[in-house]
Amino acid sequence: MRFNLAERILNQDVLSKDEALALFEDETIDTFELLNEAYIIRKHFFGKKVKLNMILNAKSGICSEDCGYCGQSVKMKEKQRYALVEPDKIKAGAQVATENHIGTYCIVMSGRGPTNREVDHICETVHDIKVLHPQLKICACLGLTNEEQAEKLKEAGVDRYNHNLNTSERYHNEVVTTHTYEDRVRTVEIMKANHISPCSGVICGMGETNEDIIDMAFALREIDADSIPINFLHPIKGTKFGGLDLLSPMKCLRIIAMFRLINPSKEIRIAGGREVNLRSLQAIALKAANSIFVGDYLITGGQPNELDYQMIEDLGFEIDG
């Protein structure tokens, strides 16, 4: 490529925000050129390995927040509701994850944040899972948390905590009004302070600008998230963003490539909405990303695991772990 981007970045010459935005918006630069540069970086740090992740929706539909993308929002009248599931169901999910060569098992709860009782419930269950499946990484996604809860999660064996920034600081109030951008950043910082690996990502396709997308990538670089899930909006009828169009597959690929160029050494995961937004180009996204969710998401379906395994094999890649 005319800019030798990969060589520059691997030599610690980081992109500036202005330069990244210019690259992202320059229509004379082919998306596949950017992907080729991203692939050189991805291969340098991760080879041809692909990390697999699986979600369990452990508590659904009980939420006070008004997130405009979410089918579990307080504003949604028709939604699946259930309280925190029993430990046996969470443990059964861990068994399925292990049998399917999943490296990270994500336990997700709806709501603004967990009660202390819910945290204790999760901690006891995670402890038991770690005894049975010591090699399985556990990611918790429970909402806004405090120091005491983070300490308990760490002691129980939680390896990673997911709390997405979701969008840029500028656009945040268009997405949700019941908590602040600073609330989200604070939760990530609490996890880092308690030596739990921070996982934080975005949702693209909610009406944000190109500048917002680049701002998101730099914000995640600034908070030093170890893992960055990139979701693409899967519009849900009845939500604020339910009437928006899907992003084009090529726009999605360009976004993923830019996130790799801006966060070169981080785990970048293709997450929710990949099937309906990337469509037939899902495999190409792994030229920049090195991680995917397999199976279903929280309230939307994924594709069969066998298709993901075949996609990885067809690329000449291999499952990490």
Swiss-Prot record:
Organism this protein belongs to: Staphylococcus haemolyticus (strain JCSC1435)
Similarity comment: family membership: Belongs to the radical SAM superfamily. Biotin synthase family.
Function according to Swiss-Prot or TrEMBL: Catalyzes the conversion of dethiobiotin (DTB) to biotin by the insertion of a sulfur atom into dethiobiotin via a radical-based mechanism.
InterPro entries found in the cross-reference section: Aldolase_TIM, BATS_dom, Biotin_synth/BioAB, Biotin_synthase, Elp3/MiaA/NifB-like_rSAM, rSAM
Gene3D superfamilies: Aldolase class I
Any one Gene Ontology BP term: biotin biosynthetic process
Co-factor remark: Binds 1 [4Fe-4S] cluster. The cluster is coordinated with 3 cysteines and an exchangeable S-adenosyl-L-methionine.
SUPFAM superfamilies: Radical SAM enzymes (SSF102114)
Pathway: Cofactor biosynthesis; biotin biosynthesis; biotin from 7,8-diaminononanoate: step 2/2
Residue intervals of the Radical SAM core domain: 45-271
Subunit architecture: Homodimer.
Pfam families found in the cross-reference section: BATS, Radical_SAM
Enzyme Commission code: 2.8.1.6
Cofactor: [4Fe-4S] cluster; [2Fe-2S] cluster
Catalytic reactions of this protein: (4R,5S)-dethiobiotin + (sulfur carrier)-SH + 2 reduced [2Fe-2S]-[ferredoxin] + 2 S-adenosyl-L-methionine = (sulfur carrier)-H + biotin + 2 5'-deoxyadenosine + 2 L-methionine + 2 oxidized [2Fe-2S]-[ferredoxin]
Binding site for [2Fe-2S] cluster: C106, C139, C199, R269
Residues that, per the record, bind [4Fe-4S] cluster: C63, C67, C70
Protein name as catalogued: Biotin synthase
UniProt keywords, alphabetically: 2Fe-2S, 4Fe-4S, Biotin biosynthesis, Iron, Iron-sulfur, Metal-binding, S-adenosyl-L-methionine, Transferase
MF-aspect GO terms: 2 iron, 2 sulfur cluster binding; 4 iron, 4 sulfur cluster binding; biotin synthase activity; iron ion binding
